[in-house]
Amino acid sequence: MTDNSNIPDGFKASGVSITGLRKSYGSNEVLKGIDLVVKPGEVVCLIGPSGSGKSTLLRCVNLLEQPNGGTIHVGGFETTDPDVDLDKMRQKVGMVFQQFNLFPHLTVTENCTVAQTKVLKRQASQAKEVAQKNLTHVGLADFGDRYPDELSGGQQQRVAIARALSMDPTLMLFDEPTSALDPETVGEVLAIMRSLAKAGMTMLVVTHEMSFAKEVADRVIFMDGGVVVEEGPAKDVIGNPQQPRTQDFLKRVLDPTHVQIAE
Protein backbone atom coordinates (compact mmCIF):
# COMPACT_ATOMS: atom_id res chain seq x y z
CA MET A 1 0.00 0.00 0.00
CA THR A 2 1.12 3.56 -0.59
CA ASP A 3 1.52 6.18 2.11
CA ASN A 4 -0.18 9.17 0.52
CA SER A 5 1.17 11.52 3.19
CA ASN A 6 4.80 10.75 2.38
CA ILE A 7 5.23 11.19 -1.37
CA PRO A 8 8.92 11.76 -2.20
CA ASP A 9 9.92 15.04 -3.83
CA GLY A 10 10.92 13.06 -6.92
CA PHE A 11 7.28 12.20 -7.60
CA LYS A 12 5.00 15.21 -7.92
CA ALA A 13 1.94 13.03 -8.00
CA SER A 14 -1.21 14.00 -9.91
CA GLY A 15 -4.69 12.90 -9.06
CA VAL A 16 -7.37 11.97 -11.58
CA SER A 17 -11.02 13.00 -11.50
CA ILE A 18 -13.47 11.53 -14.03
CA THR A 19 -17.12 12.54 -14.17
CA GLY A 20 -19.83 11.11 -16.42
CA LEU A 21 -17.36 9.67 -18.94
CA ARG A 22 -18.97 8.23 -22.06
CA LYS A 23 -17.40 6.64 -25.10
CA SER A 24 -19.11 5.04 -28.09
CA TYR A 25 -17.98 3.33 -31.27
CA GLY A 26 -20.89 3.85 -33.60
CA SER A 27 -23.97 2.52 -31.83
CA ASN A 28 -21.88 0.54 -29.32
CA GLU A 29 -21.56 2.49 -26.07
CA VAL A 30 -18.41 1.20 -24.38
CA LEU A 31 -18.33 3.58 -21.38
CA LYS A 32 -21.67 4.53 -19.88
CA GLY A 33 -21.17 7.47 -17.56
CA ILE A 34 -18.10 6.50 -15.53
CA ASP A 35 -17.29 8.42 -12.33
CA LEU A 36 -13.85 7.80 -10.85
CA VAL A 37 -11.41 9.59 -8.55
CA VAL A 38 -7.77 8.61 -8.05
CA LYS A 39 -6.04 10.55 -5.28
CA PRO A 40 -2.42 11.70 -5.65
CA GLY A 41 -0.13 8.83 -4.69
CA GLU A 42 -2.93 6.27 -4.88
CA VAL A 43 -2.82 2.96 -6.76
CA VAL A 44 -6.12 1.93 -8.33
CA CYS A 45 -6.55 -1.34 -10.25
CA LEU A 46 -9.29 -1.84 -12.83
CA ILE A 47 -10.45 -5.43 -13.17
CA GLY A 48 -13.21 -7.09 -15.14
CA PRO A 49 -13.92 -9.27 -18.17
CA SER A 50 -12.65 -8.50 -21.65
CA GLY A 51 -14.79 -5.89 -23.34
CA SER A 52 -15.87 -4.22 -20.11
CA GLY A 53 -14.32 -0.87 -21.06
CA LYS A 54 -11.23 -0.93 -18.83
CA SER A 55 -8.63 -0.24 -21.50
CA THR A 56 -10.87 2.29 -23.24
CA LEU A 57 -11.20 4.17 -19.96
CA LEU A 58 -7.43 4.23 -19.57
CA ARG A 59 -6.91 5.48 -23.12
CA CYS A 60 -9.47 8.23 -22.62
CA VAL A 61 -7.50 9.63 -19.68
CA ASN A 62 -4.71 10.90 -21.95
CA LEU A 63 -6.98 11.23 -25.00
CA LEU A 64 -5.63 8.36 -27.04
CA GLU A 65 -9.37 7.84 -27.37
CA GLN A 66 -11.64 10.88 -27.62
CA PRO A 67 -14.55 10.71 -25.14
CA ASN A 68 -18.08 11.43 -26.34
CA GLY A 69 -19.10 12.99 -23.04
CA GLY A 70 -18.04 13.78 -19.51
CA THR A 71 -15.00 15.49 -18.04
CA ILE A 72 -11.52 14.30 -17.07
CA HIS A 73 -9.09 16.22 -14.86
CA VAL A 74 -5.46 15.14 -14.52
CA GLY A 75 -3.49 17.31 -12.13
CA GLY A 76 -4.16 20.88 -13.23
CA PHE A 77 -5.46 19.94 -16.68
CA GLU A 78 -8.98 19.34 -17.87
CA THR A 79 -8.09 16.94 -20.64
CA THR A 80 -11.56 17.14 -22.20
CA ASP A 81 -11.28 20.93 -22.63
CA PRO A 82 -10.95 21.62 -26.39
CA ASP A 83 -8.29 24.24 -25.61
CA VAL A 84 -6.12 22.01 -23.41
CA ASP A 85 -2.41 21.85 -24.27
CA LEU A 86 -2.29 18.13 -25.05
CA ASP A 87 1.49 17.97 -25.40
CA LYS A 88 2.04 19.54 -22.00
CA MET A 89 -0.62 17.33 -20.41
CA ARG A 90 0.78 14.14 -21.93
CA GLN A 91 4.26 14.97 -20.64
CA LYS A 92 2.88 14.31 -17.16
CA VAL A 93 1.10 11.06 -18.03
CA GLY A 94 3.21 7.97 -18.65
CA MET A 95 1.56 4.98 -20.30
CA VAL A 96 2.75 1.39 -20.57
CA PHE A 97 0.95 -0.80 -23.09
CA GLN A 98 0.43 -4.53 -23.52
CA GLN A 99 2.74 -4.75 -26.53
CA PHE A 100 5.73 -2.65 -25.34
CA ASN A 101 5.65 -0.28 -28.39
CA LEU A 102 9.42 0.22 -28.42
CA PHE A 103 11.11 1.62 -31.51
CA PRO A 104 12.84 -1.45 -33.02
CA HIS A 105 15.50 0.58 -34.87
CA LEU A 106 16.63 2.42 -31.72
CA THR A 107 18.78 1.12 -28.89
CA VAL A 108 17.40 0.81 -25.38
CA THR A 109 19.00 4.11 -24.38
CA GLU A 110 17.75 5.86 -27.51
CA ASN A 111 14.22 4.60 -26.81
CA CYS A 112 14.47 6.32 -23.43
CA THR A 113 15.99 9.59 -24.69
CA VAL A 114 14.19 10.43 -27.94
CA ALA A 115 11.08 11.92 -26.33
CA GLN A 116 13.16 13.72 -23.72
CA THR A 117 15.14 15.58 -26.38
CA LYS A 118 12.27 16.20 -28.79
CA VAL A 119 9.45 17.00 -26.34
CA LEU A 120 11.16 18.18 -23.16
CA LYS A 121 14.02 19.78 -25.14
CA ARG A 122 16.64 18.29 -22.85
CA GLN A 123 20.26 18.25 -23.87
CA ALA A 124 21.41 14.85 -25.09
CA SER A 125 23.78 14.41 -22.16
CA GLN A 126 21.06 15.14 -19.60
CA ALA A 127 18.57 12.88 -21.38
CA LYS A 128 21.09 10.03 -21.37
CA GLU A 129 21.76 10.55 -17.65
CA VAL A 130 18.02 10.41 -16.88
CA ALA A 131 17.61 7.33 -19.07
CA GLN A 132 20.48 5.56 -17.33
CA LYS A 133 19.00 6.35 -13.91
CA ASN A 134 15.67 4.81 -14.90
CA LEU A 135 17.23 1.82 -16.65
CA THR A 136 19.14 1.17 -13.44
CA HIS A 137 15.88 1.43 -11.51
CA VAL A 138 14.31 -1.32 -13.65
CA GLY A 139 17.40 -3.54 -13.46
CA LEU A 140 18.72 -2.93 -16.97
CA ALA A 141 21.71 -0.67 -16.31
CA ASP A 142 23.96 -2.61 -18.70
CA PHE A 143 21.46 -2.99 -21.55
CA GLY A 144 21.60 0.52 -23.03
CA ASP A 145 23.33 -0.46 -26.28
CA ARG A 146 21.04 -3.38 -27.08
CA TYR A 147 18.09 -3.34 -29.45
CA PRO A 148 14.56 -4.44 -28.53
CA ASP A 149 14.74 -7.68 -30.52
CA GLU A 150 17.72 -8.72 -28.40
CA LEU A 151 15.61 -8.59 -25.23
CA SER A 152 13.05 -10.89 -23.66
CA GLY A 153 9.46 -9.73 -23.38
CA GLY A 154 9.91 -8.93 -19.71
CA GLN A 155 13.03 -6.90 -20.44
CA GLN A 156 11.26 -4.99 -23.22
CA GLN A 157 8.41 -4.13 -20.88
CA ARG A 158 10.88 -2.92 -18.27
CA VAL A 159 12.45 -0.68 -20.92
CA ALA A 160 8.98 0.66 -21.70
CA ILE A 161 8.53 1.52 -18.02
CA ALA A 162 11.95 3.22 -17.91
CA ARG A 163 11.06 5.18 -21.05
CA ALA A 164 7.83 6.40 -19.48
CA LEU A 165 9.58 7.34 -16.22
CA SER A 166 12.22 9.29 -18.14
CA MET A 167 9.56 11.89 -18.96
CA ASP A 168 9.06 12.61 -15.23
CA PRO A 169 5.34 11.70 -15.19
CA THR A 170 3.07 12.52 -12.27
CA LEU A 171 0.66 9.73 -13.26
CA MET A 172 1.35 6.27 -14.68
CA LEU A 173 -1.20 4.31 -16.68
CA PHE A 174 -0.64 0.56 -17.15
CA ASP A 175 -2.78 -1.30 -19.69
CA GLU A 176 -2.44 -5.02 -18.87
CA PRO A 177 1.37 -4.71 -18.84
CA THR A 178 1.94 -8.44 -18.22
CA SER A 179 -0.63 -9.95 -20.59
CA ALA A 180 1.84 -10.49 -23.45
CA LEU A 181 4.60 -11.91 -21.25
CA ASP A 182 5.73 -15.46 -20.59
CA PRO A 183 4.78 -16.56 -17.07
CA GLU A 184 8.40 -16.57 -15.88
CA THR A 185 8.89 -12.89 -16.82
CA VAL A 186 5.67 -11.55 -15.30
CA GLY A 187 7.21 -11.29 -11.84
CA GLU A 188 10.04 -8.99 -12.89
CA VAL A 189 7.60 -6.43 -14.31
CA LEU A 190 5.29 -6.63 -11.31
CA ALA A 191 8.29 -6.06 -9.03
CA ILE A 192 9.01 -2.75 -10.77
CA MET A 193 5.38 -1.72 -10.43
CA ARG A 194 5.46 -2.59 -6.73
CA SER A 195 8.50 -0.36 -6.27
CA LEU A 196 6.75 2.54 -8.01
CA ALA A 197 3.69 2.10 -5.83
CA LYS A 198 5.83 2.01 -2.70
CA ALA A 199 7.57 5.22 -3.80
CA GLY A 200 4.25 7.06 -4.09
CA MET A 201 3.61 7.17 -7.84
CA THR A 202 -0.04 7.66 -8.76
CA MET A 203 -1.01 4.59 -10.78
CA LEU A 204 -4.12 3.50 -12.67
CA VAL A 205 -3.67 -0.13 -13.69
CA VAL A 206 -5.73 -2.46 -15.87
CA THR A 207 -4.75 -5.97 -14.82
CA HIS A 208 -5.79 -9.60 -14.54
CA GLU A 209 -3.12 -10.20 -11.87
CA MET A 210 -5.43 -10.50 -8.86
CA SER A 211 -2.68 -11.22 -6.34
CA PHE A 212 -0.86 -8.06 -7.43
CA ALA A 213 -4.04 -6.01 -7.19
CA LYS A 214 -4.83 -7.35 -3.73
CA GLU A 215 -1.30 -6.71 -2.49
CA VAL A 216 -0.50 -3.33 -4.04
CA ALA A 217 -3.73 -1.49 -4.87
CA ASP A 218 -5.30 0.99 -2.48
CA ARG A 219 -8.59 0.41 -4.29
CA VAL A 220 -9.95 -2.03 -6.84
CA ILE A 221 -12.70 -1.19 -9.32
CA PHE A 222 -14.64 -3.98 -11.02
CA MET A 223 -16.11 -2.99 -14.39
CA ASP A 224 -18.56 -4.84 -16.59
CA GLY A 225 -20.58 -3.67 -19.57
CA GLY A 226 -19.11 -0.18 -19.50
CA VAL A 227 -20.12 0.62 -15.92
CA VAL A 228 -18.54 0.40 -12.47
CA VAL A 229 -20.20 -2.55 -10.74
CA GLU A 230 -18.23 -2.51 -7.49
CA GLU A 231 -15.34 -0.58 -5.96
CA GLY A 232 -13.59 -0.43 -2.63
CA PRO A 233 -10.44 -1.45 -0.78
CA ALA A 234 -8.60 -4.22 -2.60
CA LYS A 235 -8.95 -6.70 0.25
CA ASP A 236 -12.73 -6.21 0.26
CA VAL A 237 -13.46 -6.29 -3.48
CA ILE A 238 -11.20 -9.27 -4.15
CA GLY A 239 -11.50 -11.04 -0.81
CA ASN A 240 -15.17 -10.42 -0.05
CA PRO A 241 -17.03 -9.05 -3.10
CA GLN A 242 -20.62 -7.98 -2.50
CA GLN A 243 -22.04 -7.87 -6.03
CA PRO A 244 -23.06 -11.19 -7.68
CA ARG A 245 -21.36 -10.24 -10.95
CA THR A 246 -18.10 -9.50 -9.15
CA GLN A 247 -18.37 -12.76 -7.23
CA ASP A 248 -18.88 -14.75 -10.42
CA PHE A 249 -15.98 -13.05 -12.23
CA LEU A 250 -13.53 -13.60 -9.38
CA LYS A 251 -14.63 -17.20 -8.92
CA ARG A 252 -13.85 -17.84 -12.58
CA VAL A 253 -10.51 -16.01 -12.45
CA LEU A 254 -9.29 -17.38 -9.14
CA ASP A 255 -10.67 -20.90 -9.60
CA PRO A 256 -10.75 -21.83 -13.31
CA THR A 257 -12.06 -25.30 -12.44
CA HIS A 258 -15.32 -23.55 -11.52
CA VAL A 259 -16.01 -22.69 -15.15
CA GLN A 260 -18.60 -24.90 -16.77
CA ILE A 261 -18.54 -25.49 -20.52
CA ALA A 262 -21.94 -25.52 -22.15
CA GLU A 263 -22.73 -28.73 -23.98
Name each model feature, range by range:
Residues K235-E263:
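C-terminal boundary and immediately downstream tail of ABC-type ATPase nucleotide-binding domains
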Residues M1-R22, T257-E263:
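ABC-family P-loop ATPase nucleotide-binding domain
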Residues F11-A234:
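ABC family nucleotide-binding domain
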